[in-house]
Amino acid sequence: MKHRIVTAAQMKEIERAGDAHGLPYLQMMENAGIAAYAELQKQFSHPGRLLVVCGKGNNGGDGFVIARTAAKDDWNVTVLLAEGEPKTSDAILNFERLHSLPVPICTDCSVLETQHFDAAVDALYGTGFHGEPVSYTHLRAH
């Protein structure tokens, strides 16, 4: 698959055009999460322990899709809500879909001190990020 780099504004326009032509934002989120999980699978020969660090926006929603897909594929998944519960409707829906699976949802970073993970997914910020970068030194690697 050939990839091209686009700006945040171009990505927003691509998504808007997709939605206008019958590809809903929720389906785009599903597709993005499944594609990201497929990349993760290429790095591991068998399921392990996965940490998915999610933000409160649509990038976090992508993370919830990754977590759900991995859990259904026998990964031991933990989700860390780094900024609290999701705020966008599509992210909320994908967050709620996790509740039927054995996926612990944490808001306390102490999970990083008490558990070992084979892989971690950063689903904090995407193209909608604005403002000053936030320091997540409490999410440091161990």
Predicted features and spans:
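Positively charged, low-complexity intrinsically disordered leader regions
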Residues: 1-46
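Structural motif
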Residues: 49-51, 119
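Glycine-rich, N-terminal phosphate-binding loop of Rossmann-like dinucleotide-binding domains
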Residues: 54, 124-125
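Active-site-proximal loop->helix
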Residues: 61-105
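Short amphipathic alpha-helix with an adjacent loop that forms part of the alpha/beta core around
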Residues: 109-116
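Glycine/threonine-rich flexible loop motifs
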Residues: 125-136
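Conserved small/polar residues in nucleotide/adenosyl-binding loops
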Residues: 137-142
